Amino acid sequence: MKRTWQPSKLKHAGVHGFRARMATENGRKVIKARRAKGRVRLSA
C-alpha cells in the first residue's frame, strides 16, 4: 500500500495557498486570524 502523503507543491497550494484562502469568505477569516495573531507565514 502506498503512503498517504505524496507531496506536490502545486496541489498543496491549490488547497492551502494564499489565493485559495482569499477565494472564500471563510478563507479570508483564516488569513485575518493569522494576521491578528502575528504569524510570519499567512499561508502555504
Curated annotation (Swiss-Prot):
<dbReference type="Pfam" id="PF00468">
    <property type="entry name" value="Ribosomal_L34"/>
</dbReference>
<keyword id="KW-0689">Ribosomal protein</keyword>
<comment type="similarity">
    <text>Belongs to the bacterial ribosomal protein bL34 family.</text>
</comment>
<dbReference type="GO" id="GO:0006412">
    <property type="term" value="P:translation"/>
</dbReference>
<dbReference type="GO" id="GO:0005840">
    <property type="term" value="C:ribosome"/>
</dbReference>
<dbReference type="GO" id="GO:1990904">
    <property type="term" value="C:ribonucleoprotein complex"/>
</dbReference>
<dbReference type="InterPro" id="IPR000271">
    <property type="entry name" value="Ribosomal_bL34"/>
</dbReference>
<keyword id="KW-0687">Ribonucleoprotein</keyword>
<protein>
    <recommendedName>
        <fullName>Large ribosomal subunit protein bL34</fullName>
    </recommendedName>
</protein>
<dbReference type="InterPro" id="IPR020939">
    <property type="entry name" value="Ribosomal_bL34_CS"/>
</dbReference>
<dbReference type="GO" id="GO:0003735">
    <property type="term" value="F:structural constituent of ribosome"/>
</dbReference>
